[in-house]
């Protein structure tokens, strides 16, 4: 009897040993798979496909940087995007950025979120490959407690892991109107940024505040001024202009301008200042005759530094004289592009000798949006086109983004979120005549940046989709009750080349920013999503 019992005991011991060995060998694999499945819950197919951070094509980094360093961007750090929007002309043209997908043929979009959160991320800039700068904290709720900000942060360009963050304000404590700011990198790598009536210079390596100044706001009180618009002149002088919140409005955020204007409140006139890029000394200040809600651009005109300003009634031209340290208005050049029923024009764009304007920047229930071009030498020489035709009963035209231009291809791109369409327009640069080349169904209120070479230009568009289809567009926009995706399109035809999954909304008024190695960055209310397009993998047998 003893022997069978011993054999049974030995068998039990062997089973236990084998079970323990199996546990030790297999449990890490089982755990890893379980953790992977848990981590994948809530991810979109684009994120599942990436399964981790996206470095992009690292073989392109030095080539793209060398290309960018050859571009004429005086006043700005030479990188793929060292300015709020490419350069002083805010051209939105990124010829050194690479589209890594197939121009014709199926593509796969990969996406991955930043490791750290950046509330209200709005603009993202590159310096060297691997370096990413983010402005955020400037997209608060309209009322109630607001997040601290604005802030500037530096992050790893692949993981989104924060390196440093510098907070500039806290509206709960200061009482300041906190609205959108922008981000520009100086040639020496430092950062100049402004908000409310304040301007600071930051060390681009450490985030330390090097200089600060308070800016005059002219005819409008400081409580309703926001020096969001900052552009650098060819001589290096920083030209700033403020947005103004309607008098009596107490809402926070940039959308306060639209919401309170729709309630009949009136904006005060804007102010423009010239500031030294190193000392932040105010060199000159000039009051504008009316509000200027949209950004200005800077270009050379007949040997002078010209500043084209979109104002609520149209567009004006100012000159900056570095020798005299003087800002002045050119009263011979005034454009009034709006027809009865249309609203303010958006920020101007340049195409050859023409200044391009988009109407209905704050919306119209009665008249469709139009594109107007005015000659730089003669403001009376204008042409107009209605790319989407007349406004139908019950439609709302809302076209807040500036028109995108492509001088090499003589193309203009117009986006009207209200009617849910984007148009490609061909301009005859000799005569100013325009012809609509294509109209596509794509609802966006964002910029329309262009990537790559002249013969294979790629148009980047966000695409807005309401979560409740029957919900009025205005309500969905004001409450953020919608999702948004990125589409990559053939800029010549509007044809979709690739499209991402739908994510939370792109931060209002921000840019889908091209990065090194074929990546783009999609800023959101929580941080950013890096994306890359690659040719779709062939199916494995």
Regions found by a protein language model. Give the residues of each.
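Repeated scaffold domains used in trafficking and secretory/extracellular systems
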Residues: 116-125, 172-183, 219-232, 290-300, ...
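Beta-strand-rich domains and repeat architectures in extracellular enzymes and scaffolds
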Residues: 64-152, 172-182
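Sequence/structural signature of beta-propeller modules
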Residues: 16-109, 533-541
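Short, conserved, GDST-rich strand-edge loop motifs in beta-rich repeat architectures
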Residues: 135-149, 242-266, 360-368, 462-481
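Loop/turn-rich, solvent-exposed surfaces of beta-rich toroidal or solenoidal domains
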Residues: 397-424, 437-491
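Blade-level signature of beta-propeller repeat domains, shared across WD40, Kelch, NHL, RCC1
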Residues: 496-541
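Beta-propeller blade signature
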Residues: 149-160, 207, 257-280, 317-321, ...
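Blade-loop segments of beta-propeller domains
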Residues: 117-123, 136-141, 147-190, 196, ...
């Amino acid at each position: 009897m003893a022997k069978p019992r011993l054999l049974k005991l030995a068998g039990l011991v062997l089973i236990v040993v084998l079970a323990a060995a199996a546990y030790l060998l297999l449990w890490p694999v089982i755990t890893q798979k379980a953790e992977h499945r848990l981590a994948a819950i809530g991810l979109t197919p684009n994120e599942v496909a990436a399964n981790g951070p996206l470095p992009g094509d690292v073989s392109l980094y030095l080539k793209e940087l060398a290309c960018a360093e050859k571009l004429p961007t005086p006043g700005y750090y030479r990188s793929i995007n060292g300015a709020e929007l490419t350069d002083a002309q805010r051209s939105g043209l990124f010829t050194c950025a690479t589209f890594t997908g197939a121009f014709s043929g199926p593509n796969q979009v990969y996406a991955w979120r930043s490791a750290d959160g950046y509330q209200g991320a709005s603009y993202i800039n590159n310096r060297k490959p691997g370096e990413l700068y983010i402005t955020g904290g400037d997209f608060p709720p309209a009322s109630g407690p607001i997040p601290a900000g604005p802030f500037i942060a530096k992050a790893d360009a692949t993981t989104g892991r924060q390196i440093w963050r510098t907070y500039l304000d806290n509206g709960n404590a200061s009482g300041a109107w906190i609205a959108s700011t922008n981000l520009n990198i100086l040639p020496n790598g430092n950062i100049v940024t402004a908000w409310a009536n304040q301007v600071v210079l930051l060390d681009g390596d450490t985030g330390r505040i090097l200089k600060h100044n308070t800016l005059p706001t002219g005819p409008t009180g400081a409580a309703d001024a926001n020096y969001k618009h900052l552009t650098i002149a060819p001589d290096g002088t920083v030209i700033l202009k403020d947005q103004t919140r309607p008098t009596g409005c107490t809402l926070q955020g940039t959308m306060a301008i639209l919401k309170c204007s729709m309630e009949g409140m009136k904006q005060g006139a804007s102010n423009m200042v010239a500031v030294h890029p190193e000392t932040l000394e105010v060199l000159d200040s000039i009051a504008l005759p009316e509000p200027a809600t949209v950004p200005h651009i800077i270009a050379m005109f007949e040997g002078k530094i010209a500043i084209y300003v979109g104002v609520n009634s149209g567009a004006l031209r100012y000159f900056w004289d570095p020798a005299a340290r003087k800002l002045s208005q050119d009263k011979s050049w005034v454009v009034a592009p709006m027809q009865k029923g249309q609203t303010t024009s958006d920020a101007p764009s340049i195409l050859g000798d023409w200044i391009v304007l988009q109407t209905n920047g704050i919306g119209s229930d009665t008249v469709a949006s139009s594109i107007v071009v005015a000659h730089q030498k003669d403001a009376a020489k204008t042409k107009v086109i209605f790319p989407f035709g007349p406004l139908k009963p019950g439609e709302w035209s809302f076209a807040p983004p500036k028109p995108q231009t492509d001088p090499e291809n003589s193309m203009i791109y117009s986006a009207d979120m209200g009617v849910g369409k984007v148009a490609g327009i061909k301009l005859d640069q000799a005569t100013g005549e325009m012809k609509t080349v294509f109209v596509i169904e794509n609802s966006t209120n964002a910029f329309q940046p262009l990537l790559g070479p002249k013969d294979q230009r790629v148009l980047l568009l966000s695409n807005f989709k309401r979560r409740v289809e029957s919900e009025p567009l205005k309500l969905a926009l004001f409450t953020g009750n919608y999702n948004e995706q990125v589409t990559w399109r053939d800029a010549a035809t509007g044809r979709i080349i690739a499209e991402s999954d739908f994510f939370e909304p792109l931060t209002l008024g921000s840019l889908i920013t091209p990065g090194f190695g074929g990546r783009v960055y999609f800023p959101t209310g929580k941080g950013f999503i890096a994306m890359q397009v690659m040719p779709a993998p062939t199916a494995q047998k």
